[in-house]
């Protein structure tokens, strides 16, 4: 939906329809949108999930969202995409239109009659307000020593970053916090390994973004697992004098891998990490490095990092037990988690 923000709003207004977006489309759709009800997918929100599943018709705009389990299979689906091979690839489509999203919506707006009943829209907006309150509650508790709440950290980054910042997010738990707590402004951009889900993407993408857009703030949001795979890139950042702000969400584990294993009923195996002092590594490479283990020092350290010229790495000791709940919990997920805990106890 890039470049079609106004058209999406106009279509939603005419149909009194809620708008749901994917993680990849968040920065293009969320901002200044009175009809948005949150994100869908594993990192998404109940309001986004249920809006799609309680609707009678779903219109998919320029999306190749790969997680079919989150798409409804018992309602009518229409899809617009400029690439014909994407039509019907992820879900059974009743109507498929091949074309530019912006131009196609413009044509449709002239043919559609306004829908005056806003009952469904208001129901979903009310649910979304509750979801937002729940998400905000996680940021009110900063956490404890060496167990800083990542939700709080990401919410502070959102407040401090510039309106046109470029964020890069590592695959894993960092993606969850970025998806839920970084807000779109219409000028911000977010990069990640959204199609492939490969690890260790944040720092290389940040290097590319900083070289391509030297006048914009670039923030690399790294997991400790991802950063461990790309430590050599810190030298590249210094060599090219790139003023990237590198924030490490250091939960001393491969958090998302661990969670996926538990959901599948597997005992935790080789997901805990023995990390180096990332701040000292950064200093050895020639950039400024900070360690943060006290939640009361998060805000002042982030402020210092954003105000300093040149590259900075902030290594924040986050809570390894912070959970990312999916928008809808299935029975199989609960059974798998219980099996995982049982196997761990036996062993």
Model region roles, listed by residue range:
Residues 17-23, 78-81, 246-249:
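Short internal beta-strands
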Residues 25-126:
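Glycine-rich, acidic loop regions that bind phosphate or pyrophosphate groups
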């Amino acid at each position: 939906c890039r470049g079609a923000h106004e058209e999406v709003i106009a279509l939603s207004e005419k149909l009194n329809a809620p708008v749901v977006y994917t993680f990849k489309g968040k920065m293009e759709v969320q901002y200044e949108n009175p009809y948005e009800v949150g994100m869908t997918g594993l990192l998404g929100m109940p309001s986004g999930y249920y809006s799609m599943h309680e609707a009678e018709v779903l219109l998919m705009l320029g999306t190749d969202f790969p997680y079919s389990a989150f798409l409804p299979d018992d309602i009518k689906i229409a899809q617009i995409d400029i690439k014909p091979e994407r039509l019907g690839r992820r879900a059974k489509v009743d109507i498929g239109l091949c074309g530019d999203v912006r131009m196609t919506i413009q044509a449709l707006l002239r043919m559609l009659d306004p829908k005056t009943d806003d009952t469904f829209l208001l129901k979903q907006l009310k649910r979304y307000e509750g979801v937002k309150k729940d998400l905000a509650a996680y940021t009110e508790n900063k956490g404890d020593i060496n167990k800083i709440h990542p939700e709080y950290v990401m919410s502070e980054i959102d407040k401090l970053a510039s309106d046109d910042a470029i964020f890069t997010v590592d695959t894993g738990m960092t993606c969850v916090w970025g998806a839920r707590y970084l807000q779109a402004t219409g000028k911000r951009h977010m990069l990640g390994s959204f199609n492939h889900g490969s690890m260790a993407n944040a720092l290389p993408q940040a290097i590319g973004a900083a070289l391509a857009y030297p006048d914009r703030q670039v923030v690399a949001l790294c997991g400790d697992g991802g950063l461990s795979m790309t430590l050599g890139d810190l030298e590249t950042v210094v060599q090219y004098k790139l003023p990237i702000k590198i924030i490490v969400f250091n939960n001393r584990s491969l958090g998302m891998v661990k969670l996926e294993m538990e959901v599948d009923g597997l005992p935790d195996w080789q997901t805990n990490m023995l990390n180096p002092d990332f701040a000292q590594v950064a200093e050895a490479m020639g950039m400024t490095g900070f360690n943060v283990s006290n939640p009361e020092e998060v805000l002042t350290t982030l402020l210092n990092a954003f105000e300093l010229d040149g590259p900075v790495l902030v290594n924040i000791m986050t809570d390894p037990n912070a959970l990312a709940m999916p928008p809808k919990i299935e029975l199989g997920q609960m059974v798998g988690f219980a099996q995982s805990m049982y196997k761990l106890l036996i062993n």
